[in-house]
């Protein structure tokens, strides 16, 4: 301790280091009185830069994790009763998305998901499941869904029409030739009566009967195309024997007047006119 004599009052003024320490502690508690060091300034600027780069809505605390962007799987339409999309069945994706007009089953690779269709041994089989391979009731269906009796998926490709006949239930395609109209030739079956009478077939390539070409020499058309009278005394008859189309005897001009009309699908039509009714 130091003793200081004051010239004014000749009194002792004792000084100690305690006020100085108090001043120092008070100045240390004041933030404005402390100037940060260069290392502290660099650290604070680095933390501020990292906070600025952090996306909005996330926390910088160590305990919280940043949410990741969830990638939602693309949805495809399910259309029961419509053929399956060939591109989706083969590759598992479809570029048309919800605009595609075909069906996109739950499992494009085929097979049955046991979690979707219950197996109930002893119950009757679900007819809708056996036919289409799907059941709209899912696990609530009360019938059996055997996985080994799924129907074979029919896949349609946007290509040209196949010239083969595909019988249901057969693994190999039955090769069937087509006539000049695109109708099937089946020599071992009966003649298509619709085609024989009208020259066309409403069933097309799916018809199970024979459609011979009109110019074949060994086929005989057993039916006549008779129509109502166009005018009094005028009738139309068709020449049905294809083997003798060019060998038909023409009546003499003394009895009849022969007028050739036209040739339609191999038929030669003639108008037999009575000379008394002719103009």
UniProtKB/Swiss-Prot annotation:
Residues 11-77 are annotated as: Disordered. It comes from the Eukaryota. One of its GO terms (molecular function) is mRNA binding. PANTHER family: PROTEIN PHOSPHATASE RELATED (PTHR12506), ZINC FINGER CCCH DOMAIN-CONTAINING PROTEIN 26 (PTHR12506:SF50). This is Zinc finger CCCH domain-containing protein 42. The keyword DNA-binding applies. Keywords: DNA-binding, Metal-binding, Repeat, Zinc, Zinc-finger. Pfam families: zf-CCCH (PF00642). Gene3D superfamilies: 2.30.30.1190, Zinc finger, CCCH-type. A zinc finger (C3H1-type) spans 79-107, 120-148, 186-214. InterPro entries: Plant_ZF_CCCH, Znf_CCCH, Znf_CCCH_sf. Residues 16-39 have a biased composition (Low complexity).
